[in-house]
Amino acid sequence: MTAVQLIVGLGNPGPEYDQTRHNAGALFVERLAHAQGVSLVADRKYFGLVGKFSHQGKDVRLLIPTTYMNRSGQSVAALAGFFRIAPDAILVAHDELDMPPGVAKLKTGGGHGGHNGLRDIIAQLGNQNSFHRLRLGIGHPGHSSLVSGYVLGRAPRSEQELLDTSIDFALGVLPEMLAGDWTRAMQKLHSQKA
């Protein structure tokens, strides 16, 4: 069981993307930072907002890339490389089209599923895809031609409340995730329903 050393929240930078569906991962890390009393500070060396807290005597770093989504790997690789964090000690929180709002699931490894942020992270980590993912459901607009506008749009209040609930569920299994007990974390998280 590899303990988590880096938690990444994916999104796009700037106020025009704030609270959009595509920024669900960044929202998770913002909420986590707040819960841990951590300030996220811009660091150009890592192309993102960074923070850290201690868990059982070990540093856990937080990162929200300030690159655009399709360049997220630049930020993740810079920080992971500097601190020598292996891919299996990284958790990436991201929006998931294939799950409805209110659902959060964990996954270890796998492909990018068409998610440009995950695609770039896999590429920048040297085609290593063994990192863990926190998938936050945002739902699907129904047709692939509508996806871009959908993910870059803001969800109605009812959907946003469901996303907030799924983030609460995910924060509830933080101790298991930090300990690297993915089986227990998945059992607890996957049994939650918004």
From Swiss-Prot:
Question: Which of UniProt's keywords are assigned here?
Answer: Cytoplasm, Hydrolase, RNA-binding, tRNA-binding
Q: Which family does it belong to?
A: Belongs to the PTH family.
The active site is formed by 22 (proton acceptor)
The Gene Ontology biological process terms listed for this entry are:
protein quality control for misfolded or incompletely synthesized proteins; rescue of stalled ribosome
Q: Which GO molecular function entries does the Swiss-Prot or TrEMBL record give? A: peptidyl-tRNA hydrolase activity; tRNA binding
Q: Where is this site: Stabilizes the basic form of H active site to accept a proton?
A: 95
Q: What is the name of this protein?
A: Peptidyl-tRNA hydrolase
First-listed, main subcellular location of the protein, grouped into a coarse class: cytoplasm
Q: What class of enzyme is it?
A: hydrolase
Which residues does the UniProt site feature Discriminates between blocked and unblocked aminoacyl-tRNA point to? 12
Q: Which InterPro entries match?
A: Pept_tRNA_hydro, Pept_tRNA_hydro_CS, Pept_tRNA_hydro_sf
Q: Which Pfam families does this entry report, sorted A to Z?
A: Pept_tRNA_hydro
GO cellular component annotations of the record: cytoplasm
**Assembly mode:** Monomer.
Function of the protein: Hydrolyzes ribosome-free peptidyl-tRNAs (with 1 or more amino acids incorporated), which drop off the ribosome during protein synthesis, or as a result of ribosome stalling.
Against HAMAP family, the record matches this protein to: Pept_tRNA_hydro_bact
Q: What catalytic reaction does the record list?
A: an N-acyl-L-alpha-aminoacyl-tRNA + H2O = an N-acyl-L-amino acid + a tRNA + H(+)
Annotated tRNA binding sites: 17, 68, 70, 116
PROSITE patterns to which the protein is assigned, alphabetical: PEPT_TRNA_HYDROL_1, PEPT_TRNA_HYDROL_2
